[in-house]
Amino acid sequence: GLWEKIKEKANELVSGIVEGVK
């Protein structure tokens, strides 16, 4: 569903931010 896609994108963004901080 739409919410699953939103959560998936949010997880990708968080992962990208975490990788950038490392």
Swiss-Prot record:
Domain of life of the native organism: Eukaryota
Main subcellular location of this protein, as a coarse class: secreted
GO cellular component: extracellular region
BP term (GO), one: defense response to bacterium
Claim: Membrane is one of the keywords in the record: no
Lysine amide found at: 22
Compartment(s) of residence: Secreted
Keywords: Amidation, Amphibian defense peptide, Antibiotic, Antimicrobial, Secreted
UniProt tissue specificity: Expressed by the skin parotoid and/or rostral glands.
General function of this protein: Antibacterial peptide, that adopts an alpha helical conformation which can disrupt bacterial membranes. Each caerin displays a different antimicrobial specificity.
Family, as annotated: Belongs to the frog skin active peptide (FSAP) family. Caerin subfamily.
Protein name: Caerin-3.3
Lineage of the organism: Eukaryota, Metazoa, Chordata, Craniata, Vertebrata
